[in-house]
Amino acid sequence: MAVCARLCGVGQSGGCRRRQQRKGAGNGPELEDEEEEDEVRIEAEVIGGQAAEAPRRPRSLLHLPPEILVEIFSSLPGTELPSLAQVCRKFRQILTTDTIWKRRCKQEYGVCENLRKLEVTGVSCRDVYVKRINPRVKSGRFMKILPDYEHMEYRDIYTCLLHQYRHILGLWQPDIGPYGGLLNVVVDGLFIIGWMYLPPHDPHVDEAMRLKPVFRIHLMERNDATVECMYGHKGPHNGQIQIVKKDEFSTKCIQTDYHRMSGGRQEEFRTWLREDLGRTLEDIFHEHMQELILMKFIYICQYDNCLTYRRIYHPPSRPDDLLNPGFFKGTYGSHGLEIVMLSFHGTIAKVTKITGDPNVPAGQQTLEVDLTRPVQLPDVEHLRNFDEMSRLILDVQAQIHREQRQTGNEEDDGRGAGPDKAEHSQQPAPVLRPANEDANKVDGGDGEEQKPPNVQSFVLPTGVMARNEEYPRSCKMCFYGTGLIAGHGFSSPERTPGLFILFDEDRFGFIWLELKSFSLYSRMRDRFQQSEAPSVEAFEEMLQNMQSWTT
């Protein structure tokens, strides 16, 4: 925009001074149109101190062919185009060209749908409806509630839909008490849709995530964006979206009767149990699990008409990270599968809950791994012994406590470390190395299988509970870590020792020593746009705020 202004000669250095001089000379407003054209004159180039003669070249942007101006304006950010339209009347006319706004919609928001195709082919309209509005439609009445694309332009899409609701695009965590969640608001064709990410059914941690639409925004008519709630089984209905403050917005359903089912709460509970958890009442034998599931259903029903969302970011990555940070789904015993976020902070890896449970709610740091404390696993036969595994972990914990007491005593005495101690404290952190080759052999008689140098055999110790037996039988590295446990209502929280196991780039596990339990985590392979944190400081601040959202 600034470049165009300089080329046009507007501002204090060009047309504005001429306009002020003419007004001072008594010129009336009838000359404004002529002045606008004067303001877009391009100054002659000066080469070697003399004006370069170019009699056949355009001397102003107004003399350029319209298609070239369209190409120039199409490359500018959409937020700058309204200011450009104020330069002169011809610019305003050119900016009504829909090609400009079509390119801005595609480059800034990824809109690839063709409005003109949608208006002439009913099949495309039906595809749009079935895919994004109501996947259960079976009748031919869908045309009655489709947007009026025939009289719509890309400028309407950009200004009244994409630009107006740009602040809600990205990742969000709903405020549903301890349960949390993961919402991804994206531009999907000519719609803005909020997709709630649900873990696969327990215990299939390696399966893909399930997506459930929560709300959608689109233009039913020009200059009129419509917000619709997608809860329930009766199709989309009226809703509202309010941007509360920066990085926070809320949704409200206007027609909550669309959420109700003819069979009452019992039918709603059975449907929710089948769709969200993949279970039936007959599958749940344990009374404690029945209480947990019923409690979650009652809690969620209280938020089906109004929800508040807070922005979260994808964790930043560095080249020296142990593995790529991101979102994972993990097993948490009777609580089922939950979504967590792995992030790295120097020599510490943190795993934060995105979804939670009544014991440890969403937003809390479920795991903390000390990457300077690698643990060398024994061979498979000794690894099956839980006491041997426990001894390895507790030895590392005891060493940490001794170092902490030693540091505390030195601070209390008011003395710095001696030469020997100072030399010890300045030693670099242990090198993160894979297990040695002696531990990489699997018993097999003469036909022993030799594993790669950076991989060793792994098996869960006897007595450690796992949701299923489909866990990797080899790992790359192991580290000492702590896990957060608490009573119901997040009472008496404490960190207990455990073992972090890195299986591969997409899977890791954690053995909870005190609980004799094993959690397996698998990476979410979904790609999230507009989810990067503006800075590392902003991400750290978000992590701190998340812990206060649910406490």
Swiss-Prot record:
Its main location: cytoplasm. Zn(2+) binds at C229, H237, C253, H259. Belongs to the FBXO31 family. Residues 58-104 form the F-box domain. GO terms for biological process: anaphase-promoting complex-dependent catabolic process; cellular response to oxidative stress; DNA damage response; mitotic G1 DNA damage checkpoint signaling; proteasome-mediated ubiquitin-dependent protein catabolic process; protein ubiquitination; SCF-dependent proteasomal ubiquitin-dependent protein catabolic process. This is F-box only protein 31. SUPFAM superfamilies: F-box domain. Substrate-recognition component of the SCF(FBXO31) protein ligase complex, which specifically mediates the ubiquitination of proteins amidated at their C-terminus in response to oxidative stress, leading to their degradation by the proteasome. Fbxo31 specifically recognizes and binds C-terminal peptides bearing an amide: C-terminal amidation in response to oxidative stress takes place following protein fragmentation. GO terms for cellular component: cytoplasm; SCF ubiquitin ligase complex. It is found in: Cytoplasm. Zinc-binding is required for the structure of the protein and facilitate folding. Gene3D superfamilies: 1.20.1280.50. The lineage of its organism: Eukaryota, Metazoa, Chordata, Craniata, Vertebrata.
